[in-house]
Amino acid sequence: MIFTRIKLVNLYAFCNAELNLSYPKKQVNIPLEGEHLAGRPKFYYKKVCIITGGNASGKTSLGRILCGIQIFLRTKELRSSLRLNHKDQDASFEVDFATENFLHHRLYVRFAANETGTLSVKEVKYGYVKININDTCFKTTEKLNKLFSVGVPTPAEYYFHEISSDCNAVTLEPFKNVIFSGGWYYQLSGTQESTTEISRMNKDILERVIRTFDSSIVGVVEMTESESEDKNPSRVYLIRFKNKDYSIVTSKGDITNSERMSRGTYDAVTIAHFVSAIISDCEELSVRSDIPSMTYYLDEKLAYSHSELERIIV
């Protein structure tokens, strides 16, 4: 799915915030090509977004919210990553997103937290409109506005609205039948530093990235390890330094002899995994006729690198 608009109320420090991720018209003199929905050349959206801001400005929180929204779309369940700011007030999110089957969706969810912090849905609105061959994102957004205002869909549209009462809770039954394809990969900063379990690491990408950060690294050797007799061997990566030192990146993402690395090089392992995931997904999905949209979110892993290196990686 491709996010085109996000509105947040009472989530983390977002009291009433809205983010537009679409273009009203084709942009000129931009470094990226193809910032439009495949098959809909006038439906422009921002393919890559670089979010900047000071400490505690909401960058990590935004990633957690987006991840929580995508999990809700997949499982129809609210997760703890959607944290309320004022616990005694309802929170809500409203997202517009496009999918590869040429539909522009809108989802509105209002929810609350009880004394134990458990989240419960109070109201749900969901609908979609068709994206015609020459439609812009602005045009279909106007269609969504009308659909949600009137609540009466045309034969080519869909609309669902459910609200809880004192007697009845929100069941989400019609919405549970709506299935969304696509996936996501969020690498978010936390209070405890950790690396992600490696599943699609590419040895060549790992070597190119970390040697960019640390010139004392001479190479990377891919090896295998057998965790148990009934499991297939897992990949590990031996990082070799000029002075004969070495570090090992395990299949769980742990790094031995990590003190040998600078903080920037340590984080570069995560960056390599992130880039590997994007390239691997592109290669795997390129052979499909119905290519699903994927979301990738990298949080602060370039904070300890030189600005020139940061630009090269991006």
What name fits each language-model region?
Residues 1-75, 247-314:
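Switch/communication elements of ASCE P-loop NTPase nucleotide-binding domains
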Residues 2-12, 16, 20, 72-282:
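Phosphate-coordinating catalytic segments in nucleotide- and nucleic-acid-processing enzymes
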